[in-house]
Amino acid sequence: MVSWDSGCLICLVVVTMAGLSLARPSFNLVVEDATLEPEEPPTKYQISQPDVHSALPGEPLELRCQLKDAVMISWTKDGVPLGPDNRTVIIGEYLQIKDASPRDSGLYACTAIRTLDSDTLYFIVNVTDALSSGDDEDDNDGSEDFVNDSNQMRAPYWTHTDKMEKRLHAVPAANTVKFRCPAMGNPTPTMRWLKNGKEFKQEHRIGGYKVRNQHWSLIMESVVPSDKGNYTCIVENQYGSINHTYHLDVVERSPHRPILQAGLPANASAVVGGDVEFVCKVYSDAQPHIQWIKHVERNGSKYGPDGLPYLQVLKAAGVNTTDKEIEVLYIRNVTFEDAGEYTCLAGNSIGISFHTAWLTVLPAPEKEKEFPTSPDYLEIAIYCIGVFLIACMVLTVILCRMKNTTKKPDFSSQPAVHKLTKRIPLRRQVTVSADSSSSMNSNTPLVRITTRLSSTADAPMLAGVSEYELPEDPKWEFPRDKLTLGKPLGEGCFGQVVMAEAVGIDKDRPKEAVTVAVKMLKDDATEKDLSDLVSEMEMMKMIGKHKNIINLLGACTQDGPLYVIVEYASKGNLREYLRARRPPGMEYSFDINRVPEEQMTFKDLVSCTYQLARGMEYLASQKCIHRDLAARNVLVTENNVMKIADFGLARDINNIDYYKKTTNGRLPVKWMAPEALFDRVYTHQSDVWSFGVLMWEIFTLGGSPYPGIPVEELFKLLKEGHRMDKPANCTNELYMMMRDCWQAVPSQRPTFKQLVEDLDRILTLTTNEEYLDLSGPLEQYSPSYPDTRSSCSSGDDSVFSPDPMPYEPCLPKYQHMNGSVKT
């Protein structure tokens, strides 16, 4: 609770955890004293933009407190009083630091105490020479420029010593750090890293790190104070070894209340019907909460019976609002009622700041009377000619298609074919972005099949395959003699999947066997099955690798059947993984006393959702549309890492009968967006709809969406705007995120980037002790029971609301008030 002498009162609830602060308004209330003149807001609370001073380590630094009539001047750093020492000298209004170091970075303040009042100036000091997170521009001038002119064997040597001169790196927390050790040798040397003299492993650091062997670099993102230390790169081959050591110092950021740029927002004038915008630049290390407030009148008065002003919150940060969006207030189609006082209010865990501006509305100038002119016959003629040409083109296309259709041979009416040889060159289908890495040109034939068709009509198309040829891809080809096939894992769209052991498929462990999954064709596979499997393999090559998708590890394409080697997920698909971990009483089986394999917490479910959002964000960045995102298509590894699968499958979206069940009994329509369901339009936003259903599956521990709802009834309910109820043990914020994913208009749904940001924030603020209270029966989520617990549902086995208002689906019992949620 913060109060001012002028009578302005704001109450904020601030949550701070792990360096992240989140400010939310407890009450959208601003109280100003009636004696305060609106034209002259109290300047004592308007903090001007602080002076920024930067210095390199070892340089002198001087700050001057330019405040007049000071009886006494005191200095503080990050709120702690400063005094003279062997490095710091205070003389009058000057503060001098002899040799600056990274620990001198922070927020400095000088306070001048006068006879009747006091004043304060702020300085931001930054003593660092840090790498930026995008500091990869020098990756292209690495050791690749050095090529051995001869085959002479030699020990490793440094190729760019100028990039290694800086040994001390002092960076602020949350920055990205990159250390480079460009080297060369013959044979090509290997590189490994030590931290403080010990082997540096991924598990030694939260978030891990990246090693780019081709650029001889180590990259650590979002560094924290625990990352301080000495980092040594060791480059060696059989002829020698060299090493180089860097020292990393991480400087913690200095906390302070939000600082608003002076002069913003500025007073503005606009004519009736025009547009106007107010800009409020906020500087805050901790996450700020920003609101735009307008002083309004009620019944001709600006103040109520209790003497408090009437206020209206125009704009506040929501679940999917970024700081850049909230810093600007747009007013469209201005009217005289929009004139008045507007306030930008910013607060964080340290304090609150605000600036005020005025909007003046002017009457619109009278328009001169326009006299009608003669029609532009030339423009009319151009339009008519254009329409005629378009009609001719459409007619030509229709006639060509009809002609091609009549020429197609009817093989069913031909006599039996005893022998036919054909070659089918399948071209690469580029469905991802142009910058995606690929090992072959897009015009390279993927596979050439030579087949012999049997005269028996019932024989499979490839039952008599004599050969098929695939060009060898050295980047992905894996030796067959190092692959040992194991037990079957199941049957997929193109054939079967088996477990296998691959020796040396991990380049960092060339002699160790790694458990993998191998996709292969069945004996009765068709040409389409083969082409689909090849297409899936090529799609996975182009998309690249990510932690939260099933990655391609290699392929066996030569001298034998086609094997596609992918990552192995030992814990199966997410749907069964969640069901196996339900508390007793939620099982489908009769054994209600069975103890679940692991005890799930609320944070576990949020983490699962966050990982899948990151995987979908990566696929969206590669221009890949999944089209079948569901818990059954997510696999779980031994370390509980979520991996999205089947994103490279070829799907015939034009020949799907959505009114029939699939072979495993699940209806794909329950995960499909309305535009995909009714119009066969698949976009990244239709994947967002499916992600909302996937969230519902996660927070019901593998529940079936829309249990017991017939498909025909489901179509009707979706068109009427009905949506599923909030699952138990799901917060209102997460449920509102699901509802945002289920917006009827695709453009109103959040992007995966926004979902990642929101889930990252929720995950950071979630404790580990929030265990799920799911011991009750599962009738709300099980297709075997009617829904009797939902507060807004009726009928057997329904998850919808009874008697919804037109275009207004049933929501949980809370309402939106000026961008906030009232419960």
Curated annotation (Swiss-Prot):
Post-translational modifications: Autophosphorylated. Binding of FGF family members together with heparan sulfate proteoglycan or heparin promotes receptor dimerization and autophosphorylation on tyrosine residues. Autophosphorylation occurs in trans between the two FGFR molecules present in the dimer.
Q: Which reaction does it catalyse?
A: L-tyrosyl-[protein] + ATP = O-phospho-L-tyrosyl-[protein] + ADP + H(+)
Entry GO terms, CC: cytoplasmic vesicle; Golgi apparatus; plasma membrane; receptor complex
Q: Which PROSITE patterns match?
A: IG_LIKE (PS50835), PROTEIN_KINASE_ATP (PS00107), PROTEIN_KINASE_DOM (PS50011), PROTEIN_KINASE_TYR (PS00109)
Which cysteines in this chain are paired by disulphide bridges? 65-110, 181-233, 280-344
- Where's it mainly located? membrane
CDD domains for the chain: IgI_1_FGFR, IgI_2_FGFR, IgI_3_FGFR2, PTKc_FGFR2
Source domain of life is: Eukaryota
According to the UniProt entry, how is activity regulated?
Present in an inactive conformation in the absence of bound ligand. Ligand binding leads to dimerization and activation by autophosphorylation on tyrosine residues.
> Where does the Protein kinase domain lie?
483-772
Which Pfam families does the UniProt record give? I-set (PF07679), Ig_3 (PF13927), PK_Tyr_Ser-Thr (PF07714)
Give binding positions for ATP.
489-497, 519, 567-569, 573
Q: Which GO terms describe its molecular function?
A: ATP binding; fibroblast growth factor binding; fibroblast growth factor receptor activity
Topologically, how does it sit relative to the membrane? Single-pass type I membrane protein
Q: Which GO terms describe its biological process?
A: angiogenesis; apoptotic process; fibroblast growth factor receptor signaling pathway; positive regulation of cell population proliferation; positive regulation of MAPK cascade
Keywords from the named record? Apoptosis, ATP-binding, Cell membrane, Cytoplasmic vesicle, Disulfide bond, Glycoprotein, Golgi apparatus, Immunoglobulin domain, Kinase, Membrane, Nucleotide-binding, Phosphoprotein, Receptor, Repeat, Signal, Transferase, Transmembrane, Transmembrane helix, Tyrosine-protein kinase, Ubl conjugation
Query: What task does this protein carry out?
Result: Tyrosine-protein kinase that acts as a cell-surface receptor for fibroblast growth factors and plays an essential role in the regulation of cell proliferation, differentiation, migration and apoptosis, and in the regulation of embryonic development. Required for normal embryonic patterning, limb bud development, lung morphogenesis, osteogenesis and skin development. Plays an essential role in the regulation of osteoblast differentiation, proliferation and apoptosis, and is required for normal skeleton development.
Domain remarks in the Swiss-Prot or TrEMBL record: The second and third Ig-like domains directly interact with fibroblast growth factors (FGF) and heparan sulfate proteoglycans.
**Name of the molecule in the record:** Fibroblast growth factor receptor 2
Species source reads Gallus gallus (Chicken)
Q: What is the lineage of its organism?
A: Eukaryota, Metazoa, Chordata, Craniata, Vertebrata
Which gene name does the record give? FGFR2
